[in-house]
Amino acid sequence: MGRSLKKGPFADAHLLKKIDAQSDSDKKSVIKTWSRRSTIFPSFIGYTIAVYDGRKHVPVYIQDDMVGHKLGEFVPTRTFHGHGTDDKKTK
């Protein structure tokens, strides 16, 4: 179930403030955030945002096809190590 259209998209205020501060300055550095729940806006395009996955910050370069998605969708939190092997053949 998606978010109601009358509410509009959500992004944390501190993340928007960091994006605005970088758009005013000429240098583009990596923006660290813990806000996986924030929706990607068109003003985020071209920036690299380091999203926290529970262990480290993973850099994500924002492209125009990512607009409307959440930041957390592009950074997995779990690592799959494969299913257990069948040890019956070795015995």
Swiss-Prot record:
This is Small ribosomal subunit protein uS19. Belongs to the universal ribosomal protein uS19 family. GO terms for biological process: ribosomal small subunit assembly; translation. GO terms for cellular component: cytoplasm; small ribosomal subunit. Disulfide bonds: none annotated. It comes from Lactiplantibacillus plantarum (strain ATCC BAA-793 / NCIMB 8826 / WCFS1). Keywords: Ribonucleoprotein, Ribosomal protein, RNA-binding, rRNA-binding. It comes from the Bacteria. Protein S19 forms a complex with S13 that binds strongly to the 16S ribosomal RNA. The lineage of its organism: Bacteria, Bacillati, Bacillota, Bacilli, Lactobacillales. The keyword Metal-binding does not apply. One of its GO terms (molecular function) is rRNA binding.
